[in-house]
């Protein structure tokens, strides 16, 4: 096996970046306020990016910045300004899909590594070699590749070149995410970061000789969702993943909550480390990994293209809803004399049993004993989103612990 692969975790905001770092990421990928493909994510201002990169580097974690839109002419002057700013704050790499954007990055900040986004349709070793010859350090493989194809790519490219591969998260119905459904239905360009996810909508069928007659396609009483993929999950196949020559194991989810990011980062961190230490230990701990992964929001799971082309079992035809095991209550930002300061994310109440989720894998059940607002007034509950609260629990948490509540 090559060197220990990197665990690469998404972050939608500065607070989520800090959680990703603390809960086990080797590297974090983020988007700025321009040129990423997640316009609906909070994204990072330059100041947040600067702070996030400093925090990550203090903990020995790398930060990659996405600049992976498919650019139009109007984007190129702004790209030059953007890369000048990034040059000063020194991220560890830029993730790029567009050759025009790539050339600008290469000109302005050649000292920053350039990684080629999955949006560039990287499906063969010839493509990898092309980008290597252009100076790219790493290529993100298309989700449409099997493990066998990835191994073949590894055998044809330079030893120093890196392969990054998605191993967990949402799957796009379109080839390497290059979808036009959002453009067609809403005028919002998925390749400019504004996807409205029409693949998750409910559809009917029209027969061409009966225009205007919309016939529902039923899988159950709620209709059918013919483009709706299950989520990718390779937690049960780490032995195959770790022997395939992949250098970076990437988690999708740059619009996910801190709870989701913490759960997935912590679980894959332990699975990777256990598998490398002792495959038998990894197999023995499989029920714990599966339980933890299913504790955050997901859409049912598939192994995607890793073992061949997906069939109908990789789709969800009867609903577009997430499964949900826990509700996210907040992050512990400070603890003093047993009282923790949090920013509330969902309602909780006095006397309620909740869980403290810790980076080391432990989960502690605790009781909410007191809730005090910033004015020093006691509250019976915490109903207001993003309210700053001072909470006393039956056991004191630690900084960066996450509070959550198990759902039935």
Language-model segments: what does each one mean?
Residues 1-11, 16-22, 27-34, 52-53, ...:
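Surface-exposed amphipathic alpha-helical tracts and adjacent flexible/coil segments at the periphery
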Residues 38-55:
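Glycine-rich, positively charged N-terminal anion/phosphate-binding segment
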Residues 65-66, 96, 116-118:
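Short beta-strand elements of ligand-binding domains
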Residues 100-101:
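Alpha-helix capping/helix-boundary segments
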Residues 109:
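Conserved phosphotransfer cores of two-component systems
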């Amino acid at each position: 096996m090559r060197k220990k692969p990197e665990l690469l975790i998404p972050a939608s905001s500065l607070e989520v970046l800090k959680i990703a770092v603390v809960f086990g990421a080797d590297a974090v990928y983020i988007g700025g306020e321009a040129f990423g493909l997640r316009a609906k994510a909070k994204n990072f201002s330059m100041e947040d990016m600067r702070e996030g990169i400093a925090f990550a580097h203090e903990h020995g974690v790398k930060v990659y910045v996405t600049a992976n839109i498919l650019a139009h002419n109007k984007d190129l002057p702004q790209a030059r300004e953007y890369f000048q700013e990034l040059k000063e704050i020194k991220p560890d790499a830029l993730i790029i899909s567009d050759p025009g954007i790539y050339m600008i990055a290469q000109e302005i900040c050649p000292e920053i590594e350039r990684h080629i986004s999955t949006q560039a349709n990287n499906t063969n070793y010839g493509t990898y070699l092309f980008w290597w010859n252009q100076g790219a350090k790493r290529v993100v493989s298309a989700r449409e590749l099997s493990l066998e194809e990835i191994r073949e790519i590894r055998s044809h490219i330079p030893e120093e070149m890196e392969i990054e591969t998605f191993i967990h998260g949402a799957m796009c119905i379109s080839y390497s995410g290059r979808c036009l459904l959002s453009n067609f239905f809403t005028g919002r360009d998925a390749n400019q970061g504004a996807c409205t996810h029409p693949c998750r909508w409910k559809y009917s069928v029209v027969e061409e000789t009966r225009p205007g007659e919309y016939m529902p396609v039923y899988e159950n009483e709620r209709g059918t969702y013919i483009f709706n993929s299950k989520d990718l999950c390779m937690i049960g196949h780490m032995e195959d993943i770790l022997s395939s020559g992949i250098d970076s194991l990437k988690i999708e989810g740059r619009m996910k909550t801190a709870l989701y990011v913490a759960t997935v980062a912590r679980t894959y961190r332990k699975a990777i480390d256990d598998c490398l230490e002792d495959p038998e230990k990894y197999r023995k701990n499989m029920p714990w990994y599966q339980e933890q992964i299913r504790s955050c929001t997901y859409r049912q799971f598939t192994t995607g293209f890793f073992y061949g082309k997906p069939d109908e079992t990789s789709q969800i035809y009867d609903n577009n809803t997430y499964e949900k095991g826990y509700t996210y209550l907040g992050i512990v930002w400070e603890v003093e004399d047993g009282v923790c300061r949090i920013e509330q994310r969902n309602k909780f109440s006095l006397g309620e049993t909740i869980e403290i989720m810790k980076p080391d894998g432990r989960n502690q059940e605790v009781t909410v004993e007191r809730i005090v607002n910033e004015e020093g007034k006691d509250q019976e509950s915490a109903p207001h989103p993003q309210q700053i609260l001072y909470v006393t629990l039956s056991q004191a948490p630690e900084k960066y612990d996450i509070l959550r509540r198990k759902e039935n």
